[in-house]
Amino acid sequence: MTKVGLRIDVDTFRGTREGVPRLLEILSKHNIQASIFFSVGPDNMGRHLWRLVKPQFLWKMLRSNAASLYGWDILLAGTAWPGKEIGHANADIIREAAKHHEVGLHAWDHHAWQAHSGNWDRQTMIDDIARGLRTLEEIIGQPVTCSAAAGWRADQQVIEAKEAFHLRYNSDCRGAMPFRPLLESGTPGTAQIPVTLPTWDEVIGRDVKAEDFNGWLLNRIQRDKGTPVYTIHAEVEGCAYQHNFVDLLKRAAQEGVTFCPLSELLSGTLPLGQVVRGNIAGREGWLGCQQMAGSH
C-alpha cells in the first residue's frame, strides 16, 4: 500500500465556486480526504498575462492549452476590472469543505504573492499572511493550522515570516520528504511538507500526452523514494479535467495507492533542512526547493 498526500490548491473565484463542489463530491464518492488550500482575497489571476512575454511561460500556456484548461474568465480576472473577492462570496462552499477535509491558507491575493512576495520586506509579508488567515478563520469559524505558499514562492524570508503564526505545518516548497527548516536563530522551524510530484500543467505536452498522464503519474508515485505528495488544482481537476481525476482515483485504488491529508504524513522526528530558491522543469520562474542540512 502506497500512501500519497493529496493537496488541492484553489487559486480563483471560479475554482472555488465551481471546482471545489465538484471535487468535494468526487472525494466523497471515493471516501478520500485531502488538504484544501484556499485563496480568499481578490481574484487578480488575469494579471499574470503580462508574463506571456517570457518564452517559458508562453510555451507552458500553449502546450497546456490554457484557454481550454482554465477558461477565459480566469485568464482575464482582475485585468480590465477589479478582481472579485473570493472568500466571503463563497463562504458556504469553504465551510462545507472544512467539515470533511483539512483546510488551510493558500493566499490572500494569489497573484500578488506569486508576482511580488519575493521582493516584499518581512513585515509586509506577515501582514499579508495575517489578512488571509484572519479571513479564512472568520469563514470557517475555527483556527487555521496549515498553509501552502501560492506558486511555491517561498524562501528563508517566507519561513521566518510564517513562524509568527504557530501553524502545525506548511507546504511551501518542492522536495522529497517532510522536514523542519532551520531558522535564522539556528532552531528548527515549523514542519514543511513538500510537494514531490509534478502537476498536470508542468508536464502535459512536454513529458506526456494528456491521455497517458494517469498511468505516467502512478508510475512516478510507485517509484517515489520519499514521501509522495501530489497537488491538483480546483481550476483544472475540478473543472475541465474532472473526469481524468476520477479515472486517476479509480486506477490508484486498483494499484494499492491511497490518498490522505498532508497532516497524516507527519510522524516521528523530522530531518533538518532549508527552503532555497530553485527551478524545476515545466514551471516558469523561481520557487522554493527543499535542501537538506549539510547539502549544497
Swiss-Prot record:
Q: Extract the SUPFAM superfamilies matched here.
A: Glycoside hydrolase/deacetylase
- InterPro entries the record matches: ArnD, Glyco_hydro/deAcase_b/a-brl, NODB_dom, Polysacc_deacetylase_ArnD
Source species, domain of life = Bacteria
Lipid biosynthesis keyword on record: yes
GO cellular-component terms in the record? membrane
Signal sequence range: none
- What broad class of enzyme is this? hydrolase
- GO molecular function terms listed in the Swiss-Prot or TrEMBL record: hydrolase activity, acting on carbon-nitrogen (but not peptide) bonds, in linear amides
* UniProt pathway: Glycolipid biosynthesis; 4-amino-4-deoxy-alpha-L-arabinose undecaprenyl phosphate biosynthesis; 4-amino-4-deoxy-alpha-L-arabinose undecaprenyl phosphate from UDP-4-deoxy-4-formamido-beta-L-arabinose and undecaprenyl phosphate: step 2/2; Bacterial outer membrane biogenesis; lipopolysaccharide biosynthesis
Q: State the UniProt keywords alphabetically.
A: Antibiotic resistance, Hydrolase, Lipid A biosynthesis, Lipid biosynthesis, Lipid metabolism, Lipopolysaccharide biosynthesis
Q: Known EC number(s)? A: 3.5.1.n3
Biological process (GO) annotations held by this record are: 4-amino-4-deoxy-alpha-L-arabinopyranosyl undecaprenyl phosphate biosynthetic process; lipid A biosynthetic process; lipopolysaccharide biosynthetic process; response to antibiotic
Domain NodB homology: from-to ranges: 2-260
Key word Lipid metabolism present in the record?
Answer: yes
Catalysed reactions listed for this entry:
4-deoxy-4-formamido-alpha-L-arabinopyranosyl di-trans,octa-cis-undecaprenyl phosphate + H2O = 4-amino-4-deoxy-alpha-L-arabinopyranosyl di-trans,octa-cis-undecaprenyl phosphate + formate
Role:
Catalyzes the deformylation of 4-deoxy-4-formamido-L-arabinose-phosphoundecaprenol to 4-amino-4-deoxy-L-arabinose-phosphoundecaprenol. The modified arabinose is attached to lipid A and is required for resistance to polymyxin and cationic antimicrobial peptides.
Q: HAMAP family given for it?
A: ArnD (MF_01870)
- Note the PANTHER family from the entry: 4-DEOXY-4-FORMAMIDO-L-ARABINOSE-PHOSPHOUNDECAPRENOL DEFORMYLASE ARND-RELATED, GLYCOSYL TRANSFERASE-RELATED
Q: Which family does it belong to?
A: Belongs to the polysaccharide deacetylase family. ArnD deformylase subfamily.
Identification of the protein by name: Probable 4-deoxy-4-formamido-L-arabinose-phosphoundecaprenol deformylase ArnD
Source species of the chain = Escherichia coli O81 (strain ED1a)
